[in-house]
Regions:
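N-terminal signal peptide c-region/cleavage motif recognized by signal peptidases
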Residues: 26-28
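Bacterial N-terminal signal peptides that target proteins for export
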Residues: 3-15
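Short acidic/polar inter-strand loop motif in beta-rich domains
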Residues: 230-241
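Solvent-exposed serine/threonine-rich low-complexity stretches and specific carbohydrate-binding patches
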Residues: 189-202
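Short, compositionally biased P/S/T/A/G/V-rich stretches that sit at domain boundaries
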Residues: 104-151
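Contiguous beta-strand segments within globular domains
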Residues: 133-174, 179-181, 206-210
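Short, low-complexity, glycine-enriched hydrophobic/amphipathic alpha-helices that associate
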Residues: 39-109
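Short, surface-exposed loop/turn segments at beta-strand-coil junctions that are enriched for proline
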Residues: 199-203, 212-221, 234
Length: 249
């Protein structure tokens, strides 16, 4: 009975706290929505420019006119770009070139990458039977894409790799990320959105590199992409891992 009275007495205050929390979060949500809208607008404009460059100088005016005519229909806009640049590969090229340009114009729009240590030096030394006489060893183990991947979302790319040194000390490495669009038995490399290449200084052990790849709103269901992750250290040739994924409904 006492607990019930206490809950009844606290109810108005809890309601006030909850309302205050929502009000406090509201500006952050609005700011994020505003940033997303600005990024989307930038990408659309850059897509028009990229498409026009491929189709000829006079295409800018024509595409702009079509976009104005269909300004309320994003699906039609996407179809116009896709038709102008030539199918799935052309659309992907225009989109990722555009988004890379927009990231460079405003770096705050670019999703941050994350590097996380997943196994210690000693753990990995036992697992792979590493010997100090091997010197510096850097290997890309695997790439995973969190499913499902849908249009108008971000594909989470997790790349696992390890670096071993004779004494477990830190060493400099370079990671490289690549993105390809696959059509039939062919694939075409497109601009990787964000940091395609990044230098790191890491201690011996296993690491997981996480980045997010934006997927265009107008991407067709069934579109296939391949991501590639490379790691290089001590001037040696890079070690590579890759993963193919499909955009679903």
């Amino acid at each position: 009975m006492t607990n019930m009275k206490l809950r009844t007495n606290l109810a108005p205050y809890l309601s006030i706290i909850a309302t205050a929390s929502l009000l406090q979060l509201s500006p952050n949500v609005q700011a994020q929505e505003s940033a997303n809208a600005e990024l989307n607008s930038c990408v659309r404009n850059e897509q028009i420019i990229t498409t026009a460059k491929g189709a000829g100088a006079g295409a800018i005016a024509g595409l702009s006119a079509m976009f104005v005519a269909h300004k309320s229909n994003d699906a039609v806009k996407g179809a116009l770009i896709g038709a102008a640049v030539g199918g799935v590969a052309g659309f992907a090229t225009a989109y990722y070139t555009a988004i890379d340009t927009c990231y460079k114009k405003n770096p705050s729009w670019k999703p941050e990458s994350k590097l996380e240590r997943t196994k210690s030096y000693e753990e990995l030394k036992k697992k792979i039977k590493y010997k100090p006489s091997q010197g510096i060893v850097a290997r890309a183990e695997m790439v995973d894409i969190v499913a499902p991947v849908k249009a108008d979302s971000q594909a989470e790319m997790n790349s696992t790799f390890y670096v071993m040194t004779p004494d477990g000390a830190e060493t400099n490495i370079t990671v490289e990320r690549k993105l390809f669009v696959v059509t039939g038995d062919k694939e075409e490399q497109v601009v990787f959105p964000g940091d395609a290449t990044q230098p790191y200084t890491v201690a011996g052990g296993e690491q997981r590199d996480t980045v997010r790849i934006p997927i265009a709103k107008d991407t067709k269901v069934g579109t296939i992409y391949r991501v590639e992750f490379n790691i290089a250290a001590a001037g040696m040739p890079p070690s590579t891992a890759s993963k193919t994924f499909t955009v679903t409904e």
